[in-house]
Amino acid sequence: MASFPHAYSVTAAGGPDGVLPVKSQGLPTLETTAPPEFGGPAGYWSPETLLTAAVANCLILTFRALAAPRKLAWSNLDVSCTGEVNKTREGLKFTKFRLDAVLSIGADADESQARALLESAKKHCLVTASLNAETELGVEIKKA
C-alpha cells in the first residue's frame, strides 16, 4: 500500500446541456449527466449513481481486505445498494444507503465470522465513513 495521504484526481467539463465527460488519468472516460429524477436522460451514470456504486464497491473491497488475513473461505460477495436522497433543513442530500449483501462461503467456513467481517467492513468502509448518511446492511450468507 502507498503511504498516506492518498490523492485521487478527476476532471469534468460541461456546458448548458448535454453529457459531462469525467476523466481520470489512465482510466476510460465516463459520460455522465443528471439522473432522470432531476430531468436528465436515462442511460447515463450520474453523480447519484456513481456515489451509490462507490458505497457498494467499498463494502466489497473493505470486506476483501478484512477477510484475507483471517483466511475466511469465501467465493463471492454480491452487493446491491440503494441511496436515498431527501430534502433536509440543509437542502437535498443523501440521507440513507441500504446495502444488501449476499456472501457465498465455503462449507467449513464460520458463518458468524463471515457475518462479523461484513459488519466490520460496513463500519470501516472509507466511503461511508466519509459521508453523513445512515448506512444499513442486510446480510444473507450461503454455504457451498
Q: What do the predicted segments below correspond to?
A:
Residues 58-59:
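Alpha-helical metal-binding/catalytic segments enriched in His/Glu/Asp
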Residues 1-53, 64-144:
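Extended beta-strand/beta-hairpin segments
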